[in-house]
Regions:
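Charged, low-complexity intrinsically disordered regions
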Residues: 3-27, 31-197
Length: 197
């Protein structure tokens, strides 16, 4: 897999760092990891989405879930996209998914546990959306963005205001899944109101 990633990086002008990186401090800026210690990341692919003026990283991570006696260790591939301009902070989860696998992601506040869109009931039934500033989130989530999200398989997307963290899968991504992860994030940004200057 590392050899395939290296070839993919060489062919596309990306960088690839296979070694274990214990410095995961930036990932801790996301609420998902408030209660889930990250042990390490590895197999980091990094590149530039020129069309959206954003830098991305796809890496394998290992994180812990649960109390000491019932500690579970998870390995998955996560994507982080640094945005060209600030956006509202929010979390989108597929309804019921994290209930089955592990504790619900800490929502921003009890009052905004689930932001509903009456006009887009199917979206609100499929995804749990939460965040600090409901008004800013409602104006940011345009009809186009909501329709795009409805049409895609999403597990977890989180904005920390300057970057997105995307769990497309809940497993270590295969080499052939990387292009679809990048296509999804690029199309996601195209459906967001970003200042790309």
């Amino acid at each position: 897999r590392q050899n395939r990633f290296q070839k993919m990086a060489n062919a596309n002008g990306w960088s690839f760092e296979p070694d274990v990186d214990w410095n995961t401090s930036y990932l801790r800026n996301f609420r998902f990891f408030d209660s889930r210690p990250i042990e390490m990341k590895s197999n980091s692919l990094q590149g530039l989405d020129i069309e959206n003026n954003s830098q991305w990283e796809i890496a394998d991570i290992v994180f812990d879930e649960g109390a000491l006696l019932a500690l579970e260790v998870y390995q998955t591939t996560v994507q982080v996209v640094r945005l060209p301009s600030p956006i509202p902070r929010f979390i989108i989860d597929k309804v019921g998914l994290f209930d089955k696998i592990f504790d619900r992601v800490i929502s921003f506040s009890e009052s905004n546990l689930h932001i509903h869109f009456k006009k887009h009931a199917a979206f609100s039934d499929k995804f749990q959306l939460s965040g600090d500033d409901e008004d800013a989130i409602r104006s940011f989530f345009t009809d186009d963005l909501i329709r795009f999200l409805e049409q895609n398989e999403i597990h977890h997307i989180e904005s920390n205001g300057e970057a997105l963290m995307i769990f497309t899968y809940l497993h270590i991504a295969r080499t052939d899944e990387v292009p679809s992860m990048l296509e999804f994030s690029s199309n996601l940004l195209k459906n967001m109101d970003l200042n790309r200057n």
